[in-house]
Amino acid sequence: VLLAIDVGNTETKLGVFARKGNDGFGEPARTWRVTTERRCTADEFGVLFAAMFHRAQISPADVRSVVISSVVPQNDRELAQACEQCFHCSPHFFTATNQNLLAVRTERPKELGSDLAAAAIAASALYGAPTIVVSFGTATTFGAVARDGAFLGAAIAPGIQISIEALVARTAKLPHVALEAPESSIGVDTVTALQSGIVYGFVGQTEGMIVRMRRELGEDAKIVATGGLADIVARHTTVIEHVEPHLVLLGLYRYAQGLPVAENQTGPA
């Protein structure tokens, strides 16, 4: 099997896939989601792997390839060492510039996050291009894939959760609230006023950005959302056509189809 790992700023997602043909797509057989911890040791990663695989009744010996997207580089070396110890193969670190599935037509391709590139690969392969990929994570990102399949660029805004945390931290009387939509956009108390501003505010942001980007990409651009909070926004707008929670993992999986079932792949420099 293939193990795909998406190391994000807030959460790390892992998925196990059965390898298929070069054009194959398949949902992960098992996924996990854990909090991203800075400065984990190889032993700590190893304990995590052992616990997850044991509970899922999957043998680590079945893992023949590991591919990683990481936006937390300080963990890369220890993570690679843990993969070598647990799965006896060196992981391949996916980046926007070491793949040939997505042409990157930005001014500085090396600055494109590996997670955005992997999500764009999966979204355009699954749903076609042009595509706008909206990721609701630590940041809210809008990635633009042109009609010919090239990645043109993105817009980046503060994420929903960090916006809430910043608002509460900088105000004396505003409480933490459940992230859910109130019945009315006009809040009748502090809690519903906050919920309206947060949920419907981000819905409005999403709709507005999609309108602007469709003017440049084409009105037929598909809208694909991912990230832990995508469902919350998607429930309150009609512009999001597809929600795929495992989009980055699926992009890594598709990328891995072109790799050998490898021992001795390249780890971080």
Regions found by a protein language model. Give the residues of each.
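ATP-binding/phosphotransfer module of carbohydrate and carboxylate kinases, centering on a glycine-rich
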Residues: 1-5, 36, 40, 163-269
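Short glycine-rich, Thr/Ser-proximal phosphate-binding strand/loop in the N-terminal lobe
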Residues: 2-56, 150-175, 181-184
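Short glycine-aspartate micro-motif
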Residues: 2-6, 67, 131-135, 224
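Gly/Ser/Thr-rich loops at beta-strand to alpha-helix junctions
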Residues: 10, 72-74, 138-141, 231
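Phosphate/pyrophosphate-binding loops at sites that engage ATP/ADP/AMP, CoA/4′-phosphopantetheine
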Residues: 49-65, 210-221
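Phosphate-bearing ligand-interacting subdomains
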Residues: 53-58, 62-84
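Phosphate-binding/catalytic loop of phosphoryl-transfer enzymes
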Residues: 81, 89-93, 98-170, 199-210, ...
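A short helix->loop->beta-strand "cap" motif at the edges of active sites that frequently abuts
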Residues: 87-90, 221
